[in-house]
Amino acid sequence: MLVAWSRRSARRSEVRLPFADRAEAGRELGARLEPLELDRPIVLALPRGGVPVGLEVARRLGTADQPVPLEVLVTRKIGYPPQPELGVGAIAEGGEPVLDQGLLDRLGLSADDLAETVRDERTELARRVAAYRGDRPLPALRDRAVVVVDDGLATGGTARAALRAVRRQRPSRLVLAVPVAAVQAMHALSGGPPDGADDLVVVTAPSTFRAVGYWYRDFGQLTDANVVTLLAQATASP
């Protein structure tokens, strides 16, 4: 089932799953965003996987006369030091670490215990910003409709950090858009400030989520070079 969902509306119809790839998912997602009639939109894709999705969203929302810009908003997961695959928080450029306090309490950790990990992730975040944008700053977001895009929403930790960072820049409207989302994460991020989006748009929210990659036939890993190429394609789009 397809779900195009926001705090204000819900819609359901048929969609074929899994998606062929991130580009197809982005086209589906862009079609669900069009009815929002966003004012001066800009698409911020979370690299790496969100970039091919975001490219198709920007193309769908823009026109030859009024293209919609695509930029990256770089984020990094903050992992549990003994088991880095377990995310205990995240950080986005322009923002502060956003930690899962409940999980930290269960693990017996404090923010101080993560200081070295956070420092390492800040370093990697800065490296990726330089790789993707060089010395160009993130465009001004104040009084614009900002669409934050990723290829899926599992726990929501990275998206929460991204939304908080964007909210600090006072956009007129903040939209989170993903092709597939876990229901629990979707509802956690749909409540507006400080952690949620003004609108949340998803293509499908399966009752049994499994993992983001399960919903794609082609879910290949992307490189920094892939991201740079996709951003160049967005700039070259008519």
Predicted features, each with a name:
Residues M1-P238:
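PRPP-associated nucleotide enzymes
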